[in-house]
């Protein structure tokens, strides 16, 4: 079941809001990775290339497939057709950012949330300055830092740029990914969410969430949603209030 790249859509919308030109190549659309990347790079001529890594494997203990060689291949292809810096990001990348950046030979990485960090990187790149001092930016040439997951104001993130994706492929048969809060204060030993989103719970206002759901439905015909919060039912009062707000808009 393909999972919509919600984080990437937030990053794309943030860049567009700041006036940057943005194109997305969704590699779920093709088995021919090199021709797809070659065509997009030659047509768009990017000044900056971002690669979003949601998972590092297929999470199947009986038939495991590691995605890292494929990611490295994608980076190599980007370098073949462009001299633009390659920036890695995403949930999968953020778990071990230094090791993965070293393995795939990317230029930079963003550990944790990327919406605001990548916008800042793009602006500084345009000025020809160094980006290694930006919190959250990983570079093998800079000193290693322990605190690498800056937490931003998720409440102010713009509506995801769904128009850059083939939404039908994701939403026609499966629920659409949706997020109304980030962060988790729980201490489950098996979970990486606090590493990626921080331990401070950041909750979006009910009206903002309901408005966004309406936009998804009216503009793209999406009827089913999968809330990807680390814990939708906490706080329980918020979950109940959001449910009532959604029902009231039917």
Model-derived regions, located:
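A short, sequence-level motif marking secondary-structure junctions
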Residues: 146-154
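Radical SAM [4Fe-4S] cluster-binding motif and immediate context
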Residues: 155-250
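Glycine-rich beta-alpha loop elements in corrinoid/cobalamin-binding modules
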Residues: 4-7, 11-14, 18, 23-147
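Active-site/binding-pocket entry motifs
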Residues: 55, 150-151, 162-164
């Amino acid at each position: 079941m393909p999972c919509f790249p919600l984080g990437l859509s937030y990053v794309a919308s943030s860049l567009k809001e700041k006036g940057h030109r943005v194109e997305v190549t969704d590699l779920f659309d093709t088995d021919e990775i090199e021709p797809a990347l070659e065509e997009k790079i030659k047509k768009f001529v990017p000044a900056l290339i971002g690669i979003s890594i949601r998972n590092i494997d297929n999470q199947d203990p009986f038939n495991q497939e590691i995605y890292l060689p494929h990611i490295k291949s994608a980076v190599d292809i980007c370098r073949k057709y462009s001299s633009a810096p390659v920036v890695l990001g995403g949930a999968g990348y953020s778990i071990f950012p230094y090791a993965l950046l070293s393995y795939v030979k990317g230029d930079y990485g963003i550990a944790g949330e990327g919406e605001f960090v990548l916008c800042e990187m793009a602006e500084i790149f345009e000025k020809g300055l160094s980006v290694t001092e930006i919190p959250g930016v990983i570079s093998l040439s800079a000193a290693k830092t322990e605190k690498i997951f800056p937490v931003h104001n998720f409440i102010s993130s713009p509506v995801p740029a769904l128009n850059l994706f083939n939404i039908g492929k994701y939403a026609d048969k499966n629920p659409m990914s949706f997020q109304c809060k980030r962060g988790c204060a729980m201490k489950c030993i098996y979970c990486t969410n606090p590493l990626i989103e921080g331990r401070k719970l950041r909750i979006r206002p009910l009206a903002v969430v309901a408005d966004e759901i309406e936009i998804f439905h009216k503009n793209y015909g999406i009827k089913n949603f999968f809330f990807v919060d680390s814990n939708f039912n906490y706080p329980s009062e918020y979950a109940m209030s959001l449910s009532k707000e959604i029902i009231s808009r039917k």
